[in-house]
């Protein structure tokens, strides 16, 4: 299975899929922490458009999480940053759905205008 892990530079998720025999790649604006040749440093949009069986996305959560309401809520100085982040993330998710058979997005409880299909806690694994 061809797997893209977007917005990931640690390589942890990519390597877990590679160990299972999948053709897994990561992509982020930052270089890979592990220096892997299976990491694409750059904008994930053109990489998503290459077509994948599975895309897992880890968009930056700073402005997207409810825990940031104190700084990013309505009327706060960083509210526009939150709006921009929501628009970018939802656009990325819609793009991924067009170019992959399956799409997953990891993020803490947030403010995105889409309903989560499931919640998974780290202690469950």
Language-model segments: which ranges?
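Class I S-adenosyl-L-methionine
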Residues: 6-7, 28, 36-52, 61-125
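S-adenosyl-L-methionine
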Residues: 1-27, 33
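N-terminal Rossmann-like NAD(P) cofactor-binding module of classical short-chain dehydrogenase/reductase
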Residues: 56
């Amino acid at each position: 299975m061809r797997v893209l892990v977007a917005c990931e530079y640690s390589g942890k998720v990519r390597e877990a899929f590679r160990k299972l025999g999948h053709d897994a790649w990561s992509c982020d604006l930052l270089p890979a922490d592990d220096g892997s040749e299976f990491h694409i440093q750059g904008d994930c949009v053109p990489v998503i458009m290459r077509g994948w069986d599975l895309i897992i996305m880890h968009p930056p959560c700073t402005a997207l999480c409810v825990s940031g309401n104190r700084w990013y809520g309505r009327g706060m100085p960083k509210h526009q940053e939150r709006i921009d982040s929501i628009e970018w993330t939802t656009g990325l998710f819609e793009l991924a759905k067009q170019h992959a058979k399956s799409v997953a997005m990891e993020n803490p409880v947030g403010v995105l205008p889409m309903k989560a299909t499931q919640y998974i806690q780290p202690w469950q694994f």
